[in-house]
Amino acid sequence: KNYLPEDQDIPRMQSLYGTNLIEKDHIQICFALAKVFKDLGQIKKSFDFLKEGNACQKRLLNYEISQDQKLFSRIRQAARHIQENTLKVSKKSSLPTPIFILGMPRSGTTLIEQIISSHTQVAGAGELEDIHFHGASLSIGDKKCSEKAIKEFRHIYLEKISKISQGSPYVTDKMPQNFLSIALICSAFPEAKIVHTKRLPAATCWSNFKEYFPNGLNYSFSLDDIIHYYSLYEDLMMFWNQYYKERIYHLNYESL
């Protein structure tokens, strides 16, 4: 919805902002008013509401960038053990082949999936949480990596996308933060395609800040944290490129 000056929702939201709301509701009103004043061309006012909403959410989460710095370090440490257990799979299979579209959140994965899944042989699955849900313990080294563990992970994931595929030989998974699990993806799915979407850093970071992510992207509520996280992401992608250069197709959003 684009707001106009005469929109009756605006005074209602402004009156709500001035009341004693619980913090979660106050945060949502801040983001809503940021959108209102952006549409009205009052950019400074919009930014002030964005800053307030993001700062409140960061306080609620008690997040520090050091949490993600440790996470990225553990991912690198676990990668070697995962790589040592890369599966060999038959090229002849009735199961669909995954196409992973990944990168920073807000980097264009949705558009890329729309383009790829418009092909008659591709089914679009959207953002699946299965790589994280079933594989995070392997990716960060919490669970001992073995060929058996990776086979079990592969089986669970392929069973899931088989139900979505509707007979299509390829299925896209556009969960952006699957970039954290590239070692596991390459070891469990040697046949998989990986598309890394990259957008201009300033556009990506700003888009993370202005969108309200209530779940999962704890770094996104501070511009400083976003910039640090973006640097961690770039370093990790360079690390993956050293080992999986032939597996990752890099696509610039601005080139589309």
List PLM regions with ranges.
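Alpha-helical solenoid repeat scaffolds of the TPR/TPR-like class and their adjacent stem/linker regions
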Residues: K1-I164
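PAPS-dependent sulfotransferase catalytic domain
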Residues: V122-A125, E129-C145, S165-L256
